[in-house]
């Protein structure tokens, strides 16, 4: 979930091209690693499972430390904990995530794609059950080929 995404991205920003966390927070006091990669936080203001304050604490730390240049964050008014989950059924989500690469100079954030609550009504419309199966790739081979071996 959101906590796991923030924790992993904060720990390994040099190994992750971009991250998107929904309704989370960070388990670490030092969240500065989240400022080293394009990162998008979406949280509903009516979330009773994980209060929006958890995400706001992370954003406030990044802003205070001047590490927010690669950060996008949205507080969706009235959205509960489950509402943002539909984001992962939108093509725009993957267009944004995959528009970033570890090899991008200075790792800029793509601000040309927006995702709002009004997009969620189309979320399941992007699902095509008759689409061909995705090609499976050998992750370690791709990483080595791109020169991102660790």
Give, region by region, the residue ranges found by the protein language model.
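Primarily recognizes the serine-hydrolase "nucleophile elbow" in alpha/beta-hydrolase
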Residues: 1-35
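Substrate-binding/catalytic groove segments of enzymes
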Residues: 17, 49-50, 66
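A structural micro-motif
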Residues: 17, 37, 69-71
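Short beta-strand/loop motif that positions the catalytic acidic residue
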Residues: 34-35, 40-43, 47
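Acidic catalytic loop of the alpha/beta-hydrolase fold
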Residues: 46-51, 82
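Short alpha-helix in the alpha/beta-hydrolase fold that links the catalytic acid
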Residues: 51-61
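Alpha/beta-hydrolase-fold serine-hydrolase catalytic core, especially in secreted/extracellular enzymes
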Residues: 60, 64-71, 77-150
């Amino acid at each position: 979930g959101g906590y796991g995404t923030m924790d992993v991205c904060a720990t390994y920003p040099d190994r992750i091209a971009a991250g998107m966390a929904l309704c989370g927070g960070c388990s670490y006091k030092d969240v500065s690693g989240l400022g080293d990669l394009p990162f998008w936080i979406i949280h509903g203001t009516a979330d009773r499972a994980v209060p929006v304050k958890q995400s706001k604490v992370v954003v406030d730390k990044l802003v205070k430390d001047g590490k927010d240049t690669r950060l996008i964050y949205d507080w969706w008014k009235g959205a509960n904990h489950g509402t943002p989950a539909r984001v992962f059924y939108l093509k725009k989500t993957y267009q944004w995530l995959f528009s970033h690469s570890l090899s991008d100079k200075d790792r800029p954030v793509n601000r040309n794609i927006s995702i709002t609550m009004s997009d969620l009504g189309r979320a399941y419309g992007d699902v095509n059950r008759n689409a061909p199966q995705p090609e499976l790739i050998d992750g370690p081979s791709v990483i080595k080929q791109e020169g991102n071996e660790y």
